[in-house]
A protein has these predicted regions:
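Charged, flexible cofactor/metal-binding loops and thiol motifs
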Residues: 118-119, 126, 130, 145, ...
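Short, well-ordered beta-strand elements within core beta-sheets of diverse protein domains
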Residues: 46-56, 121, 165-168, 235-245, ...
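Charged/polar positions within long, soluble alpha-helices
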Residues: 48, 52, 73-76, 93, ...
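A short structural micro-motif
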Residues: 66-74, 233-234, 392-397
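A helix-coil-helix interface module used to build multimeric assemblies
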Residues: 2-203, 208-212, 274-277, 288, ...
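Residue-level "edge-of-site" marker
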Residues: 63-64, 227, 389, 410
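Glycine-rich cofactor/substrate-binding loops
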Residues: 2-42, 281-500
């Protein structure tokens, strides 16, 4: 196909006359590349609307639509044309001449067009991230069932707190990622609104149909105020904040996997493909992917802060500053999506050492709270008194290098006598039950607790929620597909010379 020679349609001069260093400084063509498909679709929908409204004739519309179809095959991005929008118009004019091609831009501006293109591109990205989150949540729920009764010490301040299970811990991850999913779904509803028809910021005196263009592009409605439509980028910040929260949660998962894979913990083996070795120390299994989950979080944070800083104190409506936000959006999206994929593989392939977890949970004093609770339940001792008794006893046991399992009924009775002056007979079986981390966990069948029966209930509820979320995604994708099909049917009618 013969390449169309592009000219600067705004300044009416050859591109060679524009100083390259200035063009490169002001151009957004590199960051516009992800917008190309959306920009072409916008122009097609705009031409269909102009034709329906009688603003341009069917013959001109047909030629323009055919030229738009060829762009992705033939266009060569040049920074001297500023952005992708001018490339599209310059191509159409170069192909058809200004008499016909010059009608492409009637009743629209780059301002409403770029705002629309960003929203169209972002909504697909949001759906992609949501689907990736769903896959990660599925892996967590599958592994919950596998590690339903795998006891581990629960932590606060990285110190042993109370016994729990790996399944309980994984459900906590799942809960955070479920909220991340919900947030992006809510963001989608605010992203999927059309600015088209706002033009530069004051709309147009042409009789355009904003709602038709919105429908043809798959939007759920309009950003009605035309100034707001072209200048708003809060939806970008909202998406970036959602990505940042996802990365925060992934970084926490990554950090725990790093700790757990150390020789000191030695409770998890990470998949071979997700670790690296040393160039000098042959024994090393460095958790490289998990470490990068932590580090790459900083990139997404910086993208969010950059967008907020660019927007700070910007006067309405459009300013060139806004074009500096989109590269941060694309970067944050790529980092977030790939990080979710990496975390999914890590969690799917890792293996826990159940015996080592149980050993850690049994040897330390993680069942101390259960002993205090037992004194309250069985002997009517006020909790704060029971707490003080157990605390003092554990301090004494620790100083003698004793374990919690070394506590006998006689030792506990003596501790109660010392604290209260009362003689209390401790049943051995009841004490052993309180000392046993497995028994401690089984007793905690309160809503949200670690007891296996409660874990299974929560897991099954979350499987249902995943089904709802998958259906939500499919509904949105189908809606976008149907809008695109409708647009293409109308284009075919125009190309056949029929009224729309």
């Amino acid at each position: 196909m013969k390449r169309v020679k592009l000219i600067d349609v705004l300044k009416r001069r050859n591109l060679s006359s524009i100083p390259l260093e200035i063009a490169q400084y002001t151009s957004s063509v590199k960051s516009d590349i992800p917008l190309m498909e959306s920009v072409i679709e916008i122009n097609k929908a705009h031409i269909v609307m102009l034709t329906k409204q009688g603003i341009i004739n069917i013959n001109d519309a047909s030629q323009i639509l055919k030229a738009l179809d060829e762009i992705h095959l033939d266009i060569n991005l040049d920074p001297r044309l500023e952005d992708v929008h001018m490339h599209v118009e310059a191509y159409v004019i170069g192909k058809l001449g200004e008499e016909v091609g010059g009608k492409l831009h009637v009743a629209k501006s780059r301002n409403d067009q770029v705002a629309t293109a960003i929203r169209m591109t972002l909504r697909i990205q949001l759906l992609g991230v949501i689907q990736a989150l769903i896959e990660l949540r599925k892996v967590l729920l599958t592994r919950c069932e596998e590690y339903l009764k795998t006891v581990m010490p629960g932590y606060t301040h990285l110190q042993h707190g109370q016994p729990t299970t790996v399944a309980h811990h994984f459900l906590a991850y799942q809960g955070a990622l479920e909220r991340d999913t919900d947030r992006l779904m809510e963001t989608f509803s605010r992203v999927n609104l059309s600015p088209m028809g706002a033009c530069a910021f004051a709309t147009t005196s042409f009789n355009v149909d904003r709602k038709l263009v919105a429908e043809l592009l798959g939007f759920n409605g309009l950003i009605e105020n035309s100034i707001d439509a072209v200048s708003a980028r809060d939806f970008v910040v909202e998406a970036l904040a959602g990505f940042a929260l996802i990365m925060t949660n992934l970084s926490r998962i990554g950090e725990e996997l790093i700790l757990w894979s150390t020789s000191e913990f030695s409770v998890v083996t990470l998949p071979d493909e997700y670790v690296s070795t040393s160039s000098i120390m042959p024994q090393k299994r460095n958790p490289g992917v998990a470490e990068l989950l932590r580090a790459k979080t900083a990139h997404v944070y910086s993208d969010l802060i950059a967008a907020l800083t660019i927007l700070k104190a910007l006067p309405l409506s459009y300013n060139f500053d806004l074009q500096e936000i989109t590269p941060h959006l694309w970067n944050a999206y790529e980092v977030t999506l790939t990080s979710i994929t990496m975390a999914t593989g890590l969690l799917k392939g890792l293996k826990f050492d159940a015996q080592r977890w149980l050993q850690l949970a049994s040897e330390d004093f993680s069942t101390a709270t259960e002993i205090a609770d037992m004194l309250v339940r069985e002997h009517g001792i006020p909790f704060r008194t029971a707490y003080a008794i157990v605390k003092k006893l554990i301090h004494k046991m620790s100083s003698k290098k004793k374990k919690i399992t070394d506590i006998t009924p006689e030792i506990l009775s003596a501790a109660i006598m010392e604290a209260t002056g009362k003689r209390v007979q401790i049943d051995k079986a009841t004490l052993l039950k309180a000392l046993n981390p497995i028994e401690s966990i089984s007793a905690k069948h309160v809503t949200g607790g670690p007891a296996p029966i409660e874990i299974l209930r929560m897991k099954n509820e979350r499987v249902k929620k995943i089904g709802v979320d998958e259906q939500w995604c499919q509904t949105r994708l189908l809606s976008l597909k149907e809008a695109k099909s409708r647009l293409h049917r109308l284009i075919k009618k125009i190309e056949r010379g029929e009224r729309v």
